[in-house]
Amino acid sequence: MARKTPIEKVRNIGIAAHIDAGKTTTTERILYYTGISHKIGEVHEGAATMDWMDQEKERGITITSAATTCFWKDHQINIIDTPGHVDFTIEVERSMRVLDGAVAVFCAVGGVQPQSETVWRQANKYHVPRIVFVNKMDRIGADFYNVENQIRERLKANPVPIQIPIGAEDNFRGVVDLVEMKGIVWDDETMGAKYEVIDIPEELREKAEEYREKLVEAVAETDEELLDKYLGGEELTTEEIKKGIKKGTLDMTITPMLCGSAFKNKGVQTLLDAVVDYLPAPTEVSWIKGIDPKTGEEVSVESTDNGPFAALAFKIMTDPFVGQLSFIRVYRGQIASGSYVLNSTKEKKERVGRLLKMHANKREEIKELPAGEIGAVVGLKYTLTGDTLCDESHPVILEKMEFPEPVISVAVEPKTKADQEKMATALAKLAEEDPSFRVHTDEETGQTIISGMGELHLEIIVDRMKREFKVDAEVGQPQVAYRETIKAPVDQEYKYAKQSGGRGQYGHVFIKLEPQEPGKGYEFVNNITGGVIPKEYIPAVDKGIQEAMQNGVLAGYPVVDIKATLYDGSYHDVDSSEMAFKIAGSMAFKEAAKKANPILLEPIMKVEVEVPEEYMGDVIGDINRRRGQVQSMEDRAGNKIVTAMVPLAEMFGYSTDLRSFTQGRGTYSMEFDHYEEVPKNVADEIIKKRNG
């Protein structure tokens, strides 16, 4: 079957933004102008097409990334919706993996917000070229040039406006296109569907000339030929300027800036033109890397229809009508409904049921999905987020996604005994969809513990259990994911010998425990020489140590960042076994850890609080009371921004407290930053409580 859209004309883009920058509204307008949704959904009233889960409608924030397809100027644009709340950075990372380019939306009033910095860093990490859309130009306090400065200073990027606004706040009418040097004003009567091209207004002429010059200079620097021409005093043609903007965008030396007001229907068509003109096709980004599972060698996967099939599953969702949907991005070859593919990550064969393309929340059934495309597969049994699907005869494993460890846990129990099983099923399904969410049973209390990236993250999980799986759950007090580690190196011998009639047990080890740098994790070194412990027992010692690390010696929290070296020991021909050495390893670790100056670690959150100046003193006083350390203070749009490192344990219920002492005018965001030693007086309390 021939492709409907040649791969050069496909754009896979994400629209990334801070919570209130107006991302969903922008996406809605794109869908409106590209002719798919004829009625514009307003987030304020909770009817946006992209936000299709109930809670998103209520909270007005976008949670799951749905992939939507639309068309503009004979190009196909696949939009991956990315959430803007910091508890969902995992979703953002996940969508960054499969995008080729992004539109970063900033609010013309609020500018660069803390979350935008996180998202920007993630886009840098995955080398995602992006263009900037400064939204909400109609709002009081809108300042395009201020946002330009913030992008330069805070995000360390090189923003190059390719438009400047005509008017601002209530007088915002349109933009000056610096490439064509024309004005564009939108017609309010037709909801912005009509616009007219005008000469640049007299009062903006000088500013337009100044910014045109900056644009041409930035473009000239992307290419030797253009630079020679520019330095020789020649004019660059419109074509050359466009070519230069695209080149600079793709190699991320420049970030084109546009502006508008999605809500007032201004600037959306020019944004779509920029997506088509300046963001890359799948063939214009670097080939994705993979591993050949047979040899372990690195291979490159080219974006082309001709070649063995290879795709990445980036999102699993449960759909009430068709069951489990696996959203995939095809990198090479194509996939057909009814065919068989290999899940190389799990080494399982999968049958492809139906293939769907999503248009906001309508679905279209398709027969094939070619390279560079994004769609959903129905009927996969084993595939989870981050798995690779490929041709059985050409296995490849595409890059793995890295998921952060959860930092907060709560105990959940169903309100009725009858719901116990339903709850277990619901949680298992939700954990399949979201790798940053974990479920386990506490061995001592038998309680079900759920862990995630923040309070909001867990609230939404509990909420989804209720809505989608009809399970009402009681939620306990949030618990912090403490860890333990050691500060001093220790040598330890342990001999496990049991003689009680019949076959005995014998394992004898000498280990050295040493602290590692924070975040380095666990390392096991085998320094046994001369066969004092036979090879086959070495992994058992390692396993014993790792099992003992699950419950630390201070308060039973997992132990992190240690290096264990096995350097001596002895064995018995008859009585030694894997079991005996596992016990010896485990006991040696426990004994050593007690002497190695064990300490408790707690997650420290990077907290950003934005408040009017008069509440600044209260905020800082409160942060100090919470054992926090203020890192910096700055001004943003007439408010004060306080950045601080605060232990997660002290942050519970912060939103309520902040609301009360700022009369609801303070906002904050927080994300996990690192683990740090708990002060002794606090640690003693925690240990006493845990050990009862």
From Swiss-Prot:
Keyword annotations from UniProtKB, A to Z? Cytoplasm, Elongation factor, GTP-binding, Nucleotide-binding, Protein biosynthesis
Annotated residues for binding of GTP? 17-24, 81-85, 135-138
Supply one GO BP term: ribosome disassembly
Where found in the cell? Cytoplasm
Instruction: List, in alphabetical order, the Gene Ontology terms for molecular function in this entry.
Output: GTP binding; GTPase activity; translation elongation factor activity
Stored InterPro entries: EF-G-like_DII (IPR053905), EFG_II (IPR041095), EFG_III (IPR009022), EFG_III/V (IPR035647), EFG_IV (IPR047872), EFG_V (IPR035649), EFG_V-like (IPR000640), G_TR_CS (IPR031157)
Q: Where does the record place the tr-type G domain? A: 8-283
* Entry keyword annotation includes Oxidoreductase: no
Q: Which GO terms describe its cellular component?
A: cytoplasm
* Pfam families linked: EF-G_D2, EFG_C, EFG_III, EFG_IV, GTP_EFTU
Which protein family is named in the record? Belongs to the TRAFAC class translation factor GTPase superfamily. Classic translation factor GTPase family. EF-G/EF-2 subfamily.
Q: What does this protein do?
A: Catalyzes the GTP-dependent ribosomal translocation step during translation elongation. During this step, the ribosome changes from the pre-translocational (PRE) to the post-translocational (POST) state as the newly formed A-site-bound peptidyl-tRNA and P-site-bound deacylated tRNA move to the P and E sites, respectively. Catalyzes the coordinated movement of the two tRNA molecules, the mRNA and conformational changes in the ribosome.
Question: Sorted alphabetically, which PANTHER family does this protein's record hold?
Answer: RIBOSOME-RELEASING FACTOR 2, MITOCHONDRIAL, TRANSLATION ELONGATION FACTOR G-RELATED
Q: What is this protein called?
A: Elongation factor G
